[in-house]
Amino acid sequence: STEDGRWLFVGGVSAGKGAPLPVLSSDPIYAGVQDITSIAVARISALPEIQTVVLVAATRGLFRLKNNYSIEELPSSTNYSAALEGLSNVVNKFVGAGKKVVLVVDNPSFRDPKLCVKRKTIFDPLNSYIESQNRSDCSISIDRHMQLSQQYRKLLDEVQRLNPEMVSIFETVRHLCDVQSGLCLTHKNEKLLYSYSDHISDYAAEVIGEDLNEFLSTF
């Protein structure tokens, strides 16, 4: 929160109902989250003091991918139309209630970040093996990430295009990747960017949040 406005967080996991996903759809792939999402959307829409809604949703959730450490299967996903309809329905509800909407771009996905922390033993051959394993699983080039996430980014662009004055996209790559080297890693400035699976760390959230607050002040 800032002097100009306060945040209201809606998320987490409800016992037996999962977490809200910004998708309103009759498609069976989203059946498990419809009740809790419908309640969240209705309550937020009814609160006049909420002027801007920031939507954060994992790519794997929108496209119903099978794992939380990679989006390699995204380019072949056939769920684009369902995701577009479902996300558009949520955004249209908020826009219809007079609220602006910001779509936060999802972060790169990695395996458990704890496995990417450098480890040293007294055996040099073992150290070399550990480092080789880390290098292969703990980084992805920005180009490759963009290539894999193309369908997801197309989805956000299309939703924003339908309501360009009320919907904006907030990019996170500059905070989670090294633009100069062209790499996305699990750490930056000697601090971890992820806490577990594809969830960003408190440090990353603070860095992104500061820039997001600045972005919201001009939107």
Residues covered by each model-derived region:
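Extracellular glycan-modifying ectodomains
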Residues: 1-219
